[in-house]
A protein has these predicted regions:
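P-loop/Walker A NTP-binding module and the surrounding RecA-like catalytic core of P-loop NTPases
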Residues: 159, 167, 173-187
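Conserved inter-motif catalytic segment of the P-loop NTP-binding fold
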Residues: 42, 53-55, 62-66, 70-75, ...
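Cys/His-rich Zn2+-binding cysteine-cluster or related metal-binding knuckle/ribbon modules and their
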Residues: 1-7, 141, 180-187
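Residue-level signal for well-ordered alpha-helical segments
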Residues: 21-25, 29, 35-37, 143, ...
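Detector for small/aliphatic-rich hydrophobic stretches
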Residues: 1-58, 80-85
């Protein structure tokens, strides 16, 4: 029994336990194609390749103030009005501010669930108590934090860790996830 050569990865990680088998599917075999979910905004759907895919994660980046939050609130309202549950979490604005924007856009009657928090643990704990939504918007990923990760909100480790936890939830539960990211001079 010949031992596999040690690699940088295997030297850093104990590969002898804790993993689980991953199911591979063949690219050339027909499979179930997920149904894309329209955002109700034709150009946004076109940019997404036809709409949102359940279990996918989208990073919407751009300069502050260009309309990312407004666009996503409009998409969430359209999806919610079509009968899919939508959750919009703002780490930057109070729910009252989001409601005021919705009223200005004529979306005040849309059944979108709003929350104003920055704790990924609290978000995931709450989502774990209910049926997964069709759409989860996190506005913005730079404001989120996880108490299991070192560093302040907005640091590379926090952004990566929080995004990882949210993406894992989305994939495991078939939730379309949109993370808002603000582009800054620092990148």
């Amino acid at each position: 029994s010949e031992e596999a050569p040690a690699t940088v990865f295997s030297q850093k990680h104990d590969l002898s336990s804790g993993g689980r088998a991953v199911e591979f599917v063949s690219l050339d075999k027909p499979g179930e194609v997920p149904v894309r979910q329209s955002t109700g905004l034709a150009e946004f759907d076109r940019a997404l390749g036809g709409g949102l895919v359940p279990g996918s994660a989208i990073l919407m980046g751009g300069d502050p103030g260009i309309g990312k939050s407004t666009l996503l609130l409009q998409a969430a309202a359209a999806i919610a009005r079509a009968g899919r549950r939508c959750v919009y979490v703002s780490g930057e604005e109070a729910t009252a501010q989001v409601r005021m924007r919705a009223a200005r856009l004529g979306l005040a009657d849309a059944p979108v669930s709003l929350a104003s928090t920055t704790s990924v643990r609290d978000i995931l704990t709450t989502l774990g108590t209910m049926e997964p939504p069709g759409l989860l918007v996190i506005d913005s990923i730079q404001t989120m934090h996880s108490d299991t990760i070192e560093g302040a909100p907005g640091t590379v480790s926090q952004v990566r860790g929080c995004a990882f936890e949210l993406i894992r939830y989305a994939k495991e539960n078939g939730v379309a996830l949109v993370l808002v990211g603000h582009v800054t001079k620092d990148g």
